[in-house]
């Protein structure tokens, strides 16, 4: 991280010393540039091409050096379209890697891979910038204590808890509530942990990025009146961008998150949507650079590239970066090298189910498919572990009985199984929860449920103390006291209607 000088004398001296080269070859987003002998830029240095094309249009393209070819030539990958570039154009070596603005000025704004604002809200203070290529924290700086990152979302905290400074994979198709879950997590980390979030849109649809921005403004995650009060910074490198931008936009978002962790000493949530597109962009760049492809056509450096990104996402003694990464699984093949490499880094998985969404149970997190390495008695305690296991057993038994119920009906079940089904249906409904960010759509106030309250509620359902309550009393409530109060209201309503 560096504080940039504002005086003009240092700027003049920099321009006097600038290192200039010329484009010798252009193949799509890849440029070859020749420099004077002894003036070669380093790997990862940013190069800038400025000028005018044949139609007189202004050109400003930033590239990143990827290979030193010999004979004073380097090969660089462009971060924006190379339309209008010609051989012989002048290229300036900036002498440093790409640097992006960091700190509070980034909140509520949308950036591209170069750290330039793209939301038409004016310039951003660039006095404090940080290079996107940095080493992972040293072992001695890491916080190795295993601790739960409480989200206030019942189904997550009980059955697939997140690790503070961990990495979580978010699996789900279109329209099952990924965006709403992401926004609720952004809202809750700001309220409960005083933290901020950074959202990295890597290679996804521009329309989805725009929808997310609009929904964030609507739900108050981005504060339009006072932009500094916003809880999230957005960095987009969408599907229409060249592979260089899609490959590096994840690092831009991570660099902004690292500043909040290391300098502001905050807990940070880093969202990457979609981690598969990061790998896909790396594969495209690898082919353009002429590297021999590996399994299924992926880049030979797949594990290294993934590790370089993932190892920077961690807890230090100053703060933590907890990362939630949407994972696209190509052709639903979990053995594909891209998702398989991602799985090696994940501490928990949150799987969203279309079946639950169809039932109207939101968040539609699948309680049986979602997993977490944190769900161990020595980490979460016996009470939490036992409750979670019993909830899963009850739901699993209900799942097994569903075929029998569909064919023969509930009456054919044994007394014990009927009780299990009744409790499982209550558990299923109690796993739903009203969200703060959905208040504008549903009209019901959002609820943050602490972990101890969550465990107490499920223990009461499992113990049979609440067997007499109707199952609709458990739907879309916060803690168990709200469910019992709702049951009393339902009873009073039914009595008054008689």
UniProtKB/Swiss-Prot annotation:
A single GO molecular function term of this UniProt record: ATP binding
Keyword vocabulary terms for this entry: ATP synthesis, ATP-binding, CF(1), Chloroplast, Hydrogen ion transport, Ion transport, Membrane, Nucleotide-binding, Plastid, Thylakoid, Translocase, Transport
Localization annotation: Plastid, Chloroplast thylakoid membrane
EC id: 7.1.2.2
Coiled-coil ranges from the UniProt annotation: none
Reaction(s) catalysed (UniProt annotation): ATP + H2O + 4 H(+)(in) = ADP + phosphate + 5 H(+)(out)
SUPFAM superfamilies: C-terminal domain of alpha and beta subunits of F1 ATP synthase (SSF47917), N-terminal domain of alpha and beta subunits of F1 ATP synthase (SSF50615), P-loop containing nucleoside triphosphate hydrolases (SSF52540)
Broad class of enzyme this protein falls into: translocase
Short name of any one Pfam family annotated for the protein: ATP-synt_ab
GO CC terms in record: chloroplast thylakoid membrane; mitochondrion; proton-transporting ATP synthase complex
GO BP terms, alphabetized: proton motive force-driven mitochondrial ATP synthesis
Binding, ATP: 172-179
Record Gene3D superfamilies: 2.40.10.170, Bovine Mitochondrial F1-atpase, Atp Synthase Beta Chain, Chain D, domain 3, P-loop containing nucleotide triphosphate hydrolases
Recorded topology in the membrane: Peripheral membrane protein
Function: Produces ATP from ADP in the presence of a proton gradient across the membrane. The catalytic sites are hosted primarily by the beta subunits.
Xref: HAMAP family: ATP_synth_beta_bact
PANTHER family (alphabetical): ATP SYNTHASE (PTHR15184), ATP SYNTHASE SUBUNIT BETA, MITOCHONDRIAL (PTHR15184:SF71)
Complex formation: F-type ATPases have 2 components, CF(1) - the catalytic core - and CF(0) - the membrane proton channel. CF(1) has five subunits: alpha(3), beta(3), gamma(1), delta(1), epsilon(1). CF(0) has four main subunits: a(1), b(1), b'(1) and c(9-12).
Similarity remark: Belongs to the ATPase alpha/beta chains family.
Name of the protein in its database record: ATP synthase subunit beta, chloroplastic
Species this chain originates from: Daucus carota
Gene: atpB
